[in-house]
């Protein structure tokens, strides 16, 4: 570029920075050293499927699936992990159905979890926005999008038609939230339900409520589905759950994580260590027997789970080896380890 054009460009950039602040315009290469920072999902299997060691910070995540598939459980594990690393979490309970006893069993510090049970959708999203803009909250979970009922619908009569109200509400909210989420480095998780499209003869009839906006603004979309029931004798004690990454802007999509969600306990950490350990040649499996470093741990997966619960040192050793092999870090992964812990944006110098 010749000198005259460069001078003109420099003048324009100076004027922009004077009007909008330093860093309003930058060269992309100035931040080429930065990588996506993440916070652990609380499951090494899900962290591996996400490709960046967890949920990306400063991004919108959608977790959707059928009823009782484990969506809230997956989100609560993420909250527990953030709190374990000294972070602050907020939960917008639009469904008014959060069980504090179950949340505590999953490792959530309920005494330090900020909870809101809004009266209508606008209130819930405004509270979420306030948490995000504060810059002091590390993770915000909205449960669920389908329960964010517009105020006009709540105040109206039963049977009144309100076409597209919720979709417009979500579209407006996400337009306001997306920039604030990025600048505050907050992880925003929206839980969503599934609906059936009427009259679909071919293709997938399933869709998610709230319009298309959330699909577009989400950097990661996870589909959670029950694969099979887990039994001990005649008793059903949990579900084998498939978590598919159907959209991923920060790593390759379409990876699948399979985890055991046990009733009253959440994701079985021991179960995923066994599965991933066998897959990555850290745990040896011969028939129904499982071994580690030549020592037998037990026959059958349930017995090995109990063995790992009783031997936490071996459990931690397998976990450490797995994370090293898969390149996953335990806890928060920061863009720059030498930087302070204050919220960062691309515009920070």
From Swiss-Prot:
It is found in: Cytoplasm. GO terms for biological process: DNA recombination; DNA repair; SOS response. Residues 331-340 have a biased composition (Acidic residues). PROSITE patterns: RECA_1 (PS00321), RECA_2 (PS50162), RECA_3 (PS50163). It comes from the Bacteria. Keywords: ATP-binding, Cytoplasm, DNA damage, DNA recombination, DNA repair, DNA-binding, Nucleotide-binding, SOS response. Residues 329-349 are annotated as: Disordered. CDD domains: RecA. One of its GO terms (molecular function) is damaged DNA binding. The keyword ATP-binding applies. ATP binds at residues 65-72. GO terms for cellular component: cytosol. It holds the Pfam family RecA. Disulfide bonds: none annotated. Can catalyze the hydrolysis of ATP in the presence of single-stranded DNA, the ATP-dependent uptake of single-stranded DNA by duplex DNA, and the ATP-dependent hybridization of homologous single-stranded DNAs. It interacts with LexA causing its activation and leading to its autocatalytic cleavage. Belongs to the RecA family. This is Protein RecA. The gene is recA.
